[in-house]
A protein has these predicted regions:
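Polybasic (Lys/Arg-rich)
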Residues: 1-83
C-alpha cells in the first residue's frame, strides 16, 4: 500500500506504476493505492524518486527498507557525519 497526497494522485492515476494498480482509499488529504507486484530494486527506486510525496504503508519490510535507504541518504549529506 502506498499513500499519496490527494493533489498528486491525478498524476499517479494517469501514469500508473503497474497494471495491477488500484485505488483503495481516499480521504480529504490522501489517496492510498495497492499494487500486486514483487518488491524489487526498481520498485524501491520508483518510491524513492517520489520523495516526500509517497509513503509506504505496507508491506512493513518494504517500509523498513525505504527507511534504511533514506537514513543512508541523510548520512551522506550530514556535514558533521562527513568529518
Amino acid at each position: 500500500l502506498l499513500c499519496f497526497p490527494k493533489d498528486e494522485y491525478p498524476y499517479v492515476a494517469t501514469k500508473p506504476w503497474h497494471g495491477s494498480q488500484k485505488k483503495v482509499t481516499e480521504d480529504e488529504c490522501t489517496v492510498t493505492i495497492e499494487l500486486d507486484v514483487v518488491v524489487n530494486y526498481e520498485l524501491e527506486q520508483k518510491i524513492l524518486s517520489w520523495g516526500n510525496y509517497v509513503e509506504v504503508l505496507q508491506p512493513l519490510s518494504l517500509r523498513n527498507q525505504i527507511h534504511k535507504r533514506l537514513d543512508r541518504n541523510t548520512y551522506n549529506y550530514d556535514p558533521i557525519a562527513k568529518r
